[in-house]
UniProtKB/Swiss-Prot annotation:
Keywords: Cell junction, Cell membrane, Gap junction, Membrane, Phosphoprotein, Transmembrane, Transmembrane helix. Coiled coil: none annotated. The chain crosses the membrane at residues 20-40, 77-97, 165-185, 206-226. One gap junction consists of a cluster of closely packed pairs of transmembrane channels, the connexons, through which materials of low MW diffuse from one cell to a neighboring cell. It is a multi-pass membrane protein. Residues 242-262, 318-358 are annotated as: Disordered. It comes from Mus musculus. This is Gap junction alpha-5 protein. It is found in: Cell membrane; Cell junction, Gap junction. Its main location: membrane. One of its GO terms (biological process) is artery morphogenesis. Residues 41-76, 186-205 are extracellular. Belongs to the connexin family. Alpha-type (group II) subfamily.
């Protein structure tokens, strides 16, 4: 056979930018197909036509019978199979090398721009890389495919899987699984049915079964790689969608905190003046400062009726009543304030209105 080194060098480049299953597939292609085909299988089919014998001396009958028995030689059929199966990988390798070259050029441009900016002293905002150039990333020393390179790789696997299936089915339709030792030929110019004999049929059957098994293994690896990439992509999509849902469902500020702060049980009773009027109805139901933001925005100052509880605070704490007997009308006590003449304690000397006179 010809020299396989040229094809091997190209496939080594593909090996650098492949997944783990893809590297196993390339190993199977190198060792169990190309190596076996170039060393052992070629010697078994080297004397195929020369040792093909028929029971006739009719000129041309033997050649016609050989063409009927072997439309294409097994060894040449397998060479075509390897070429067609490897061609998608070569296309992927060309795309990968083009992407690497584009990334190198982009890095050189960025380095030149950084040098020019450093010389002029002007600050230059960093330019984000194009999405088409970031086609893989290294995680723990492993290359993880992404972007356009991943799409090309998936298309490569689909094409080579189709090729594998087509060649396996074609080999079965042409030859079956095993070669028969005796082949009966009924083609013209043979005057009658002629018996023809295949050389070393058992040895050839061993290689036929081996090559079909390797083709089946390659097909299984291609399907496994498709499943691996598809399942990985689905998990990434599901993970991103789940993260987006979690971000939208993040808990906001606790709105129920205000409702949980309940006033003491006697708080509403303290807000009644002497006439029995309430300054506000209920603490939990009337939050004036929270429920009237429009008044604050327009600059309007609410009165005591609008702001519940504020009159109570100003009456008892802000205003300081005068106790002088000669207080004028301008120094009246605030409405709702009533003095209590009861003694504050037993030791106090001040009189209370309800003390009994003796």
């Amino acid at each position: 056979m010809g020299d396989w080194s040229f094809l091997g060098e190209f496939l080594e480049e593909v090996h650098k930018h492949s997944t783990v299953i893809g590297k196993v597939w390339l190993t199977v292609l190198f060792i169990f197909r190309m190596l076996v085909l170039g060393t052992a299988a070629e010697s078994s089919w080297g004397d195929e036509q020369a040792d093909f014998r028929c029971d006739t001396i009719q000129p041309g009958c033997q050649n016609v019978c050989y063409d009927q028995a072997f439309p294409i030689s097994h060894i040449r059929y397998w060479v075509l199979q390897i070429i067609f199966v490897s061609t998608p990988s070569l296309v992927y390798m060309g795309h990968a090398m083009h992407t690497v070259r584009m990334q190198e050029k982009q890095k050189l441009r960025d380095a030149e721009k950084a040098k020019e900016a450093h010389r002029t002293g002007a600050y230059e905002y960093p330019v984000a890389e194009k999405a088409e150039l970031s086609c893989w990333k290294e995680v723990d020393g492993k290359i993880v495919l992404q972007g356009t390179l991943l799409n090309t790789y998936v298309c490569t696997i689909l094409i080579r899987t189709t090729m594998e299936v087509a060649f396996i089915v074609g080999q079965y339709l042409l030859y079956g699984i095993f070669l028969d030792t005796l082949h009966v030929c009924r083609r013209s110019p043979c005057p009658h049915p002629v018996n023809c004999y295949v050389s070393r049929p058992t040895e050839k059957n061993v290689f036929i079964v081996f090559m079909m098994a390797v083709a089946g293994l390659s097909l299984f690896l291609s399907l496994a790689e498709l499943y691996h990439l598809g399942w990985k992509k689905i998990r990434q999509r599901f993970g991103k969608s789940r993260q987006g849902v979690d971000k939208h469902q993040l808990p906001g500020p606790p709105t129920s905190l205000v409702q949980s702060l309940t006033p003491p049980p006697d708080f509403n009773q303290c807000l009644k003046n002497s006439s029995g009027e309430k300054f506000f109805s209920d603490f939990s139901n009337n939050m004036g400062s929270r429920k009237n933001p429009d008044a604050l925005a327009t600059g309007e100052v609410p009165n005591q009726e609008q702001i519940p509880g504020e009159g109570f605070i100003h009456m008892h704490y802000s205003q300081k009543p005068e106790y002088a007997s000669g207080a004028s009308a301008g120094h009246r006590l605030p409405q709702g304030y009533h003095s209590d003449k009861r003694r504050l304690s037993k030791a106090s000397s001040k009189a209370r209105s309800d003390d009994l006179s003796v």
